[in-house]
Amino acid sequence: MSMFLDTAKIKVKAGKGGDGMVAFRREKYVPNGGPWGGDGGHGGNVVFVVDEGLRTLMDFRYHRRFKADDGEKGMTKGMHGRGAEDLIVRVPQGTTVRDADTGKIITDLVENGQEFVIAHGGRGGRGNIRFATPKNPAPEISENGEPGEERNLELELKVLADVGLVGFPSVGKSTLLSVITAAKPKIGAYHFTTIVPNLGMVRTKSGESFAVADLPGLIEGASQGVGLGTQFLRHIERTRVILHVLDMSASEGRDPYEDYVAINNELETYNLRLMERPQIIVANKMDMPEAEEHLEEFKKKLATNYDEFEELPQIFPISGIAHQGLENLLEATAELLEKTPEFLLYDESDFQEEEAYYGFNPDEPEFAISRADDASWILSGDKLEKLFTMTNFDRDESVMKFARQLRGMGVDEALRARGAKDGDIVRIGKFEFEFVD
């Protein structure tokens, strides 16, 4: 049986911006030509695109790293380097993307053709033509390209079924699916026969069609990961209608009503919104001895939880193996689907807030200072490290510009306040220099 892979961890890296160029106009009859170095091109983005033709995340099992191309370097004559093409990564419909480092949901990809930029490419570094001023008409300054965004991601694929079959193991879900659809699930008289979702399409006599998922068997404690646990619950989140299958024969000595309550408790514990989905109770194995008596007892117990103004869930007595009562069940399911809207999987607060990629966050410190064991000073911080990465250290003027930027950020004053002395070693990454007081 082919394996259904519904989670995958991958790494994406957008392209680096191309380096800016230092060049000067040197042409006959053009004395003292000015700066002519162009900007680097923009690095490629990594873009997720929903492809309804994909059904699993299996491809990501063998291909876990995705890197977009870098932008081209700037050229002479003030010409910009070519920007890199975006890297398109196709994902199945229904993929949820999380930040693997924080666990926060980044996006939920549910519409065919939907696009989402998951990693932004770096901007190109500026060439020396951009740094010309009246005081410095021939600057030997250029910038390196900005690094592309890099992210560790976790992908989750939830079964895109309209209807989910839930119930304790071996209540007859797989048999029911096999007789109402063309699906061929593995069927057996032991717990956890179904360990991955089985999908099938139903077409009623009236012409309605919908997708049904026979989901892995559930036991008490699933919301805490017992048994197949949260794997099961993850698959049911997308279904709009739940068919709650119960074994009315009580052949294993179980009480159908206790099973019904236990499974609903697990659904509610995992995600309160799961209980908002309408349920149809499927009283299965009605061809077995004493099933009628068990069903009547179940109805009495169920009624005690509802007052006279509340509507009880619909109950359909069937026998999957004997093909009894199926037509009425399917017509009622199609009718309920027709009037049931799609459910949001998460509250809006679960999603990461969109921020401008190059935006300024005033609450975020621009740099941090720490002391190494060898008494050197260590500078760190996203903004500072970005400036460092984009500095062309092959050019003296670029190095001097970087030093001015550090002073403008208050690095010199902060080092002095921490006790830095003339000649102390200061490090940024692998680069080191002497502090001059």
From Swiss-Prot:
Gene Ontology molecular-function annotations: GTP binding; GTPase activity; magnesium ion binding
Major location category of this protein: cytoplasm
Positions annotated to bind GTP: 167-174, 192-196, 214-217, 284-287, 319-321
Positions of the Obg domain: 2-160
Names of required cofactors: Mg(2+)
Cross-referenced InterPro entries: G_OBG, GTP-bd, GTP-bd_Obg/CgtA, GTP-bd_prot_GTP1/OBG_C_sf, GTP1-OBG_CS, GTP1_OBG_dom, GTP1_OBG_dom_sf, OBG_GTPase
Keywords carried by this UniProt record: Cytoplasm, GTP-binding, Hydrolase, Magnesium, Metal-binding, Nucleotide-binding
One cellular component (GO) term of this entry: cytoplasm
Any GO BP annotation: ribosome biogenesis
Subcellular localization(s) per the UniProt record: Cytoplasm
Domain OCT: start-end pairs: 359-437
Subunit structure: Monomer.
Family named by the database record: Belongs to the TRAFAC class OBG-HflX-like GTPase superfamily. OBG GTPase family.
Its job: An essential GTPase which binds GTP, GDP and possibly (p)ppGpp with moderate affinity, with high nucleotide exchange rates and a fairly low GTP hydrolysis rate. Plays a role in control of the cell cycle, stress response, ribosome biogenesis and in those bacteria that undergo differentiation, in morphogenesis control.
Name of the molecule in the record: GTPase Obg
Species this chain originates from: Streptococcus suis (strain 05ZYH33)
